[in-house]
């Protein structure tokens, strides 16, 4: 057959192609690239398994792959992939390539729309809106595409004709997509968010890989589950929540329930208010968003006992004080008489308790100046101002809308000032009369001498005097006598050399004696 030699020639050329890169570096040794030299020296036994180096891309010098998320450099400068680089950094040796085995494939039925319901349990077949972000579904598609583009499938096809090669490749890819899928070596599942490998290089699923890394043994098949439960990706729940929110927003706002009214008159008013809320179209101005508290006619209608528990909010505070809140008036006559201008006056209400009279305000800064107020009198009150306390009036004491505090029917006494006793002018003069001022010549009594009157004299404050003892006598010169002018004027005529007696020396006044008298 003439076609046999032509067919044998390309077959022989294809078999010799992996050998050509080995011969080229020997012939062109000075022009060898650093990526080819370590392959010849260190990894010569891997050349039969690795495909030839592409002319337009990069290739790992260890495993021969052309795709990696990060290219690295080995210590000898060669280009390696990310997996080989991480393995070398942790183990200080190159990653073994012979342990990498092709994944297992099993036949599956092709499903156009998929059977995954999207309720958080993924079976890897698609069919839901949430499958776009599902790692199990996406990894399954990527694994199928990588499997159909593997070099094993390319080498098995014979390059007889280019047209035939294209047709067979397209048919094979469609068959692979419909009938083949990667399966776990341990449990046989085809659904996993991440494919792993054990120490033997077998492809296992994420669950088996985590169990193997934790326990050091393969996961029992009884623990296998048909579906994978994902986290917080329930599209159905989100849709249901959105529908509920849209449904609630479309509905009209609910009118607040009518408060309990004590009288039929208030019921009619409340009915009018509800009618207004239903007829208005603008919800921002409708009164049902803010409804004022109902105004009860306390002065004309009694309050039922059944409504006290519903409206009463705070318990009444009662203090023992001369001022007391006005009771609920049950008739117009009493209300008009209690608010007469001559009988009572309005006092503003306060949240603080009254002054107790102990000199300090409760919760106040300190004592109050002035005496405490007088205690309330116990006199009888007129008939029209008597307060009749009943259980119903005490229970509804906190339901008053305008709280008017009135006094009792008494007039408070004036503030008592401390009494000051003032004596007459005659008695005060007799008791507190000072002795009259007398002249120097008069004597206070018969035994005492008259007051001493010293003539004005000049004192030299620079001179100092000392008193000598009785035994020692000092002689003063004329200059000393002139300096000390405290001597009597009668002794002016003295001899210059005559000594001065002690008595005469003592008669001289010093500053201390002058000041002390």
Curated annotation (Swiss-Prot):
InterPro entries per the UniProt record, alphabetical: Transcription_factor_GATA, Znf_GATA, Znf_NHR/GATA
Biased composition (Polar residues): 1-16, 380-397
Keyword Iron: yes
One cellular component (GO) term of this entry: cytoplasm
Subcellular location: Cytoplasm; Nucleus
Bilayer-spanning residue ranges: none
UniProt biased composition (Low complexity): 263-289, 327-358, 423-432
Keywords: Cytoplasm, Iron, Metal-binding, Nucleus, Repeat, Repressor, Transcription, Transcription regulation, Zinc, Zinc-finger
Biased composition (Basic residues): 222-233
Source organism: Candida albicans (strain SC5314 / ATCC MYA-2876)
Description of what induces expression: Repressed by the HAP43 transcription regulator. Expression is also under the control of MAC1.
Gene Ontology biological-process entries: cellular response to copper ion; cellular response to iron ion; intracellular iron ion homeostasis; negative regulation of transcription by RNA polymerase II; positive regulation of transcription by RNA polymerase II
Entry protein name: Suppressor of ferric uptake 1
Gene name of the encoded protein: SFU1
Biased composition annotated in UniProt, kind: Basic and acidic residues: 147-164, 234-245, 476-507
